[in-house]
Amino acid sequence: GFDGDFFAHMEEIDLCWRMQLAGYRVRIVPRSRVYHLGGGTLQTDSPAKVFYNHRNNLAMLYKCASPAQRLCVAVARPALDLLAALSYLMQGRRDNFRAVFRAWGDFIRWHGALARKRREIRANRKGSAAENIYRGSVVLRYLFGRRTFGGMMR
């Protein structure tokens, strides 16, 4: 089920990724409707939201990504997070700046627990971590006008 250590962000992505790694197929129901209150738990620009987004994403990648993917993340992610933090600082959003570093602190403190979860995921693995990764750049697709998930897949 859901990882009880996650709160408010990325718990559903983490669950789907772990299910795929365990050999399950994640399916969609095209006619379904989802009513989602964005910012219902945390305000859009709150430091807590920045913290959970960064922390949970780091934890999810550590738990689920292949060794090669983790190497790429280990090289790129600190630089990208530093750029994000500096961007917050230049905008005068000091709390968001600090939230990025708090997320890294939590991630480092969680290392032992995450390593145990990773071993459990790998022991139950029947699928590949690579086959479900989008190979393009979401950032570039967004910048070139593909602002929806469906638009990015074209």
Q: What positions do the PLM features span?
A:
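Active-site-adjacent helix/loop segment of glycosyltransferases
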Residues: L21-R119, N124-E131
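A short, conserved alpha-helix in the catalytic core of glycosyltransferases
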Residues: G1-R33
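Glycine-rich phosphate/pyrophosphate-binding loop
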Residues: A115-R154
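Catalytic-site signature of metal-activated, phosphate-bearing donor transferases
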Residues: I13, L21, D81-Y88, V139-M152
